[in-house]
Structures are given as C-alpha cells and as structure tokens.
C-alpha cells in the first residue's frame, strides 16, 4: 500500500491535501518552489496546517521543502495540486528526480497529463512512472490565514480518474487503494469534458465583470453572480455541453446546476452554508475562473464539439 506521498502545491488545495493525508496517517511531504517558502515557514512556526469549515484540526506534514529532489525521492505517489498554467513548470521541476514505480496524480486533471508526458519525452526521462488525472478538485477551499485553510465542502477521497494512456488506469487505481477510492473514467477526456467549473464559472464571471471590478477582494461568485439571467445562460451552456458529451459517446456525470440551486436556496440546504460564506472570488478578471476554465475545459469542449460536427456557441 502507498504510504509515502508528496503533495505539490502550496496553495489552498495543496494545504488541504497535505493536512488531510497527514490526518489519515500517511507520510506526507509538502513541496513548492522558493516563491512559497514563507508559507512553509508559517506552517512550521504555527505547528501545522489548520483546517476549518467542513474539516477540523491541525496537522503537520512530515516534510516541508522547496527542494524538488528531496520532494520526489522515495515518494510512492505524487499529487499535483496547482493551476493548469503551472503544469509545464512542475513537470520540468520534478522530471530529473523521478524514480521507477511512482504514480503522478494531477488534481484537477485539465489534460495536464499531456503536458507532463510531453515534457518528460522532451527531457529524455526514462523513469517508469504513471500519469493520472482526477476529474474535478479535492474540495473547494480558501487560504484564510497563515497556515490555515477553510474548507467549503467535505474533503472526499472518492471521485473519478483516468490515466494517460488509459490502459494504465486499472493498475494505478489499484495501487492507490486506501489513499483514494477513485472509479475509472474511460479516458482523461471524459474527466475534462465533465468538469463542473466549465459551466458554472465562465459565464457567471463574465456576466458579473462590472461587479468583480467594483468589489475586488469582496466579490463572491456564489453571493453576487447567480442572477436569473446568469442562471439562464449557464443552463443553456450546460445543454450545449451535454450535446458534446453525448456526441463523444459518454454521459454527463453530474448536473452542474445542482450546486447553484442549493446556493440559491440556503434555507433548504444548510450543508452549503460554509461554502457560500467563505468561498470568495474571483477578485479580478485575471483569475483562474477564466484563464484556467476557459483554456482547459472550455476550449476542449468547443474544440471537441466542432470536430464532432456540432454548432458550439458557448
């Protein structure tokens, strides 16, 4: 069974993953580059990563390091929790130190496995490692203080994933049992086409652009963006994406409108109160809600739809 895990990424999800896996008894190394050294210093100074909201406790990873060689050495699984625009950077950073038998899991996938594979081939990496993408993220969360992350919905070790190539999926998921309990997607495309952020983030952010500019750090998509007109637009986008999914011979995994409906009806859905209250953002239009969700899932959905002969307008 996998015991030694490296979590790459010192953002909110990286903090959550490192604390969560430490809580469950794994030997966790938390890694990012020197730009994030102050965050590791905060964790050391404060005695660990504090989880608040829908997770609780303070947990100290076994190792905090900005050294990629130290981070990768002897890791059985490497979970990559960074935005898609950092995938190439991370691939180049860890490539020289990879060892046979390691499993690299990209969360969320966003077709990052293709980037990692391309970099490894370019650099002539011969280590026998696997590349796997999880559909969606570990949990919604935000850094709310030094070494503190507020989790908006319960952290869940379940989900869907696929490897690149897909023929590796079965053995990877078997190796990761006890760490995560993923069920297999057909391939990495099934994961990215089903990403909920494509429908919920892009249209609502664009339609709320003026309010984002006005409120800045005080803006919350879930408090201010889901107006009737925005919800109508998101519904249309969901239907267009459904058509692409079906044309690909796949099924929609979840109704992305469910979360919006819960947020708009808080009295009937107290389970999303923490999510609603603390998951702020975007604070500007230069934000992952646009450049990541448009550039990954959105662009893929449009491209796939066009190749399949559909008239994709979203």
Which residue stretches match the model-derived regions?
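NAD(P)+-binding Rossmann beta1-loop-alpha1 motif at the extreme N-terminus of oxidoreductases
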Residues: 1-53, 72
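Nucleotide donor/acceptor-binding cores
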Residues: 2-3, 129, 157-159
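A short helix-to-beta-strand connector/capping loop
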Residues: 54-63, 125-131
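Rossmann-like NAD(P)-binding element
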Residues: 57-98, 105
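Rossmann-like NAD(P)(H) cofactor-binding subdomain of soluble oxidoreductases
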Residues: 84-145
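Substrate/ligand-engaging "lid" and interaction regions
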Residues: 138-233, 237
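Small-residue-rich helix-loop
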Residues: 230, 236-278
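Long, low-complexity C-terminal extensions of enzymes
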Residues: 262-314
